[in-house]
Curated annotation (Swiss-Prot):
Induction: Up-regulated by karrikins treatments. Under MAX2-dependent negative feedback regulation. Keywords: Hydrolase, Repeat, Transcription, Transcription regulation. Disulfide bonds: none annotated. This is Protein SUPPRESSOR OF MAX2 1. Residues 12-83 are annotated as: Repeat 1. Disruption phenotype: Low seed dormancy and short hypocotyls. Suppresses max2 phenotypes associated with karrikin-KAI2-regulated growth. Smax1 and smxl2 double mutants have substantial reduction in hypocotyl elongation. Residues 818-855 are annotated as: Disordered. A motif (EAR) lies at residues 828-832. One of its GO terms (molecular function) is ATP binding. Residues 96-167 are annotated as: Repeat 2. Belongs to the ClpA/ClpB family. Highly expressed in dry seeds. Expressed in seedlings, rosette leaves and senescing leaves. Detected in roots and axillary shoots. Expressed in the primary rosette buds and expanding leaves of adult rosettes, the vasculature of the hypocotyls, cotyledons, and mature roots, in the midvein and petioles of young leaves, the young leaf periphery, stomata, and the root caps. SUPFAM superfamilies: Double Clp-N motif, P-loop containing nucleoside triphosphate hydrolases.
């Protein structure tokens, strides 16, 4: 097996041979029977600056902590401890195992395929480099298993090394102090390249120390071989001048520093002294050796050591005219036979010692296969020196590729911020650089006559890397905080001083909001309003002032409106710019807060905002302020501009609806769910009310937290309505607050579920102190009306005189009129004026306008009307929206006007229509509490009967100016279609 080892060693480069020798020594130290790939891998990891260690760190960035690498070393140490020990004498080197031999052959094959210039050479002449040796070792199953135990992937490390080999280009050898090689146990080698940046005396001392350690190690190995009974004739094989070790050994033998070995007092005979033509004068050795042995003392262990010199004389014949192969066969074979005879003749008193290069020793084995047996040779591989800086430039280049600082991306490449923050970042770096420039100038003033190793070391960069990273992190964080829209859009819009036009994409009702909708810039199209630059709000400016260094530019954000116009004119421009709804709906949008407009302008999510505002305003038109607030908040959150959870944006949205309008809040949630996800909302009741209930039968018997968790798990893209959060117990409120902070909700069993992209809407009944409780009473009475069975009919009645509608009467006129009792049993007076003690003109009359508009209602919930126990929850939500008390007079007016317009469109102006007061109250209750929209109900129920009436009017023509069409209750039929609060058919009684 040693013959196989020596053969393999000749195919390795000096650094690879060093690793193999280290592995064999480690196996011998542990008294193992064989040298395995585990020994080689452990040797490669022995040095902190080792090539394999760097590859592991580079391929596993998350495991680059020193403790992780230490764990890898411990795993290999444990694996080596598990290997069986040898039963032979400890003096012999352990042979190479089959697995390691296979790895070495794989490395040789890979090296041959990777080097086209070596493909024409014999297989044994291919030099295996260290990188190919490491790759082959990593392919071994035992090594892969140990690396897996330490959470490292052997294929990943192998791929990293191969990538570094593909990307590396052989550079000019540049001395570098940081390139320290592999730090393996040093051995012999050629002269080391001098580093002009180091003290030459220090280099000389270091070189002498390394050389001394290497020679002592190799000398001890040769001495051990000379003391054996078998395989006692060493041949030092190596490409780094193995003759230096021979000279040290012969010197020790001559002075007697060999201990009690058999070679003590031996004489050294060199073939150089006999003849230059060693192969032809071997026969002369017989007489010379016999004479020397007679003169020596046989009792004192005297003998002769024959120095064969370089064995190239066995395979080369410079003066021969015949081919070298023929000379080797004819003359070399004679020398081998003659020396074998001498060795047998002087057995025990004659030793051989010689040197050979790797190539020479391979040729000796090829041309003289029996030379190792005949001469009782033991090949000793001489370790090369530790690779110093510049000795192996390509290897040093690969090592530098694994250095973290070498592969660090410059700061300006990883800085991800807007142009304004980037300009501030570069300005701050310039200021820091200007401060440190005097030190640089002082360095330039140093005398040039000094050698380089005496000059002060100049930094690679003027600014320390840590300082650059600190400034970079500072401006990254500041930009994320001050300009979140820049980091959350695929199309980044850079603010510029010139005005830009903004338009929106065509509206699509099926477009879901799971993917962000980006505004589109089309400079060729003009709108009535433009986007201008406006200074930041005071709050944002104050934050920027604290974080920004002196001299940083003023931060600007995009807002809607003209800078030169007043705030009132700005409100009109915003409403006009968002002109996607009817004039009736837009005229009440004056109370959109300035903060909402600034947020809207910053995020530039106009498309999404307009879509939400239009849809919710059409369905809940009496709560236009709340609709604007909800649309602004949801559009910002869906585009990543809302509140953040830590440093990351969150997908879930939390809204709080407060106020007395319970029906309006439900309709708002329904419209929001339809617009965002195209589904109906999921309602979960947290209080004691059961009017809406939890319609899902699977929720029965479950706690509120279990209902929420199950809903989130089943529908991660949905809108969940949590009604009456103000009536929930402390446990539920605490769990909801924890879910807001963590992004995960925990059920009653302790299981956590991610909130996903759910929009949570919590409702509460908190309202302003000025809101009258009469609204709640009237809403309850409307529920009673809606619960009764009723139907409508359209009939012709004689017009007795001009009559004003009751909702147009003034308060004084209504107070003078007697109370009218209706057959429906309505127990409250719709015309009774409210108390006027507080000076308010609000009334409980469903036909009277309230004065909330004059009180400056903004749609934002004030903490003054929120109990102290809920302040913490209100501060966590993305937005808290206040719903105003409903103006029932406006609802009645809208119903009447819509019916009149539709009647006039179909019938014409030849016939007028009026609505009975009692019928109007029933229609109001159905529209208010039902799910059917007013326009939809008119198209399905009113339009068909109007078409029939038109046909009869056209055919008969008997109706004059004294006749009017009247919509009234049908007293003959007390039934209504089941499941609907409004009748689906109207009876025509003509």
């Amino acid at each position: 097996m040693r013959a196989g080892l020596s053969t393999i060693q000749q195919t390795l480069t000096p650094e690879a041979a060093t690793v193999l020798n280290q592995s064999i020594a480690e196996a011998a130290r542990r008294n193992h029977g064989q040298t395995t790939p585990l020994h080689v891998a452990a040797t490669l990891l022995a040095s902190p600056a080792g090539f394999l260690r760097r590859a592991c760190i580079r391929s596993h960035p998350n495991s680059s902590h020193p403790l992780q690498c230490r764990a890898l070393e411990l795993c290999f140490s444990v694996a080596l401890e598990r290997l069986p020990t040898a039963t032979t004498t400890p003096g012999n080197d352990p042979p190479i195992s089959n697995a390691l031999m296979a790895a070495l052959k794989r490395a040789q094959a890979h090296q041959r395929r990777g080097c086209p210039e070596q493909q024409q050479q014999p297989l044994l002449a291919v030099k295996v480099e260290l990188e190919q040796l490491i790759i082959s070792i990593l392919d071994d199953p035992s090594v892969s298993r140990v690396m897996r135990e330490a959470s490292f992937s052997s294929p990943a490390v192998k791929a990293t090394i191969e990538q570094s080999l593909n990307n590396s280009v052989t550079p000019t050898p540049i001395p570098s102090v940081s390139s320290v090689g592999l730090n393996f146990r040093p051995g012999g080698g050629g002269p080391m390249t001098r580093n002009s940046y180091l003290n030459p005396r220090l280099q000389q001392n270091a070189s002498s120390v390394q050389s001394g350690v290497s020679k002592n190690d190799d000398v001890e190995r040769v001495m051990d071989i000379l003391g054996r009974a078998k395989k006692k004739n060493p041949v030092l094989v190596g490409d780094s001048e193995p003759g230096r070790v021979i000279r040290e050994i012969l010197k020790k033998i001559e002075v007697g520093e060999v201990g009690n070995l058999a070679v003590k007092n031996s004489k050294v005979v060199s073939l150089e002294e006999i003849s230059s033509d060693k192969a032809l004068r071997i026969k002369e050795l017989d007489g010379l050796l016999q004479t020397r042995l007679k003169n020596s003392d046989p009792i004192g262990g005297g003998g002769v050591i024959l120095d064969l010199g370089d064995l190239k004389w066995l395979v080369e014949q410079p003066s021969s005219t015949q081919p070298p192969a023929t000379v080797a066969v004819e003359i070399g074979r004679t020398a081998v036979v003659e020396l074998r005879r001498l060795l047998e003749k002087f057995e025990g008193r004659l030793w051989f010692i010689g040197t050979a290069t790797c190539e020479t020793y391979l040729r000796c084995q090829v041309y003289h296969p029996s030379v190792e047996t005949d001469w009782d040779l033991q090949a000793v591989s001489v370790a090369a020196k530790a690779p110093a800086s510049g000795v192996f430039p390509r290897l040093a280049n690969n090592l530098e590729s694994f250095t973290p600082l070498k592969s660090f991306v410059p700061a300006n490449r990883t800085l991800k911020c807007c142009p304004q923050c980037l300009q501030s970042y570069e300005r701050e770096l310039a200021e820091i650089d200007s401060v440190s420039s005097p030190e640089v100038k002082s360095e330039v003033a140093q005398p040039k006559q000094l050698p380089q190793w005496l000059l002060k070391a100049k930094p690679v960069d003027r600014l320390p890397q840590a300082k650059i990273e600190e400034v970079q992190k500072k401006w990254n964080d500041a930009c994320v905080r001050l300009h979140p829209s820049f980091h959350n859009k695929n199309e980044r819009i850079v603010p510029i001083p010139v005005p830009i036009t903004l338009t929106t994409s065509p509206y699509s009702p099926n477009m879901l909001l799971r993917q962000p909708l980006q505004p589109k810039l089309q400079p060729n199209r003009e709108l009535r309003e433009r986007v201008h630059l406006k200074p930041m709000s005071p709050l944002v400016a104050e934050q920027a002032k604290k974080k920004s260094p002196p001299g940083s530019p003023v931060q600007t954000d995009l807002v809607l409106g003209r800078a030169e116009d007043s705030e009132k004119a700005g409100d009109v421009q915003v409403r006009d710019f968002l002109g996607c709804i009817s004039s009736e709906s837009v005229q009440n949008n004056n109370n959109i807060s300035v903060l909402q407009k600034e947020n809207l302008g910053n995020s530039l999510d106009i498309d999404l905002f307009k879509k939400l505002l239009k849809g919710m305003t059409e369905k809940v038109w009496w709560q236009n302020d709340a609709a604007a607030a909800v649309a602004a908040t949801v559009s910002q959150c869906k585009l990543g501009n809302g509140k953040r959870r830590g440093v990351l944006s969150k997908g879930d949205v939390w809204l709080l609806f407060s106020g007395p309008d319970r029906v309006g809040k439900r309709k708002m949630v329904s419209a929001l769910s339809s617009l965002v996800y195209g589904t109906n909302p999921i309602m979960i009741q947290l209080g004691s009310r059961q009017d809406a209930g939890d319609g899902n039968s699977s929720f029965r018997g479950k706690t509120a937290l279990d209902k929420i968790a199950e809903t989130v798990k089943r529908s991660p893209f949905s809108v969940i309505l949590l009604e009456d959060i103000d009536e929930a117990d402390m446990l539920v409120r605490g769990s909801i607050k924890q879910a807001m902070d963590r992004g995960r909700i925990r059920d009653s069993h302790g299981r956590e579920i991610s909130l996903g992209n759910v929009i949570f809407v919590m409702t509460a009944s908190w309202h302003f102190a000025g809101t009258k409780t009469s609204f709640l009473d009237n809403e309850a009475k409307l529920r009673d009306l809606a619960s009764e069975s009723w139907r409508l009919r359209l009939c012709m009645r004689e017009k007795f005189g001009k009559r004003r509608a009751s909702w147009l009467c003034s308060d004084e006129e209504r107070l003078t009129k007697p109370k009218k009792e209706h057959g429906s049993g309505l127990s409250f007076d719709l015309n009774q004026a409210a108390d006027t003690d507080d000076g308010s003109h609000n009334t409980s009359d469903l036909t009277t306008d309230n004065d909330q508009d004059e009180q400056g209602f903004s749609g934002k919930l004030s903490l003054q009307c929120v109990p102290f126990a809920f302040h913490d929850m209100v501060s966590r939500v993305d937005d808290a929206v206040a719903f105003r008390a409903v103006d029932f007079a406006a609802v009645r007016r809208r119903i009447t006007e819509t019916l009149s317009e539709r009647f006039e469109t179909i019938i014409g102006e030849s016939l007028s229509v009026e609505v009975e007061e009692e019928a109007l109250q029933r229609i109001l209750s159905g529209v208010w509490l039902g799910q059917t929209e007013l326009e939809e109900w008119i198209e399905k129920a009113i339009v068909p009967v109007l078409s029939q009436l038109k046909a009869r009017v056209s055919s008969s023509g008997t109706y004059g100016d004294c006749t009017v069409a009247r919509l009234e209750l049908d007293e003959d039929s007390g039934e209504r279609n089941a499941g609907d609060l409004l009748p689906t058919t109207i009876t025509l009684a003509v």
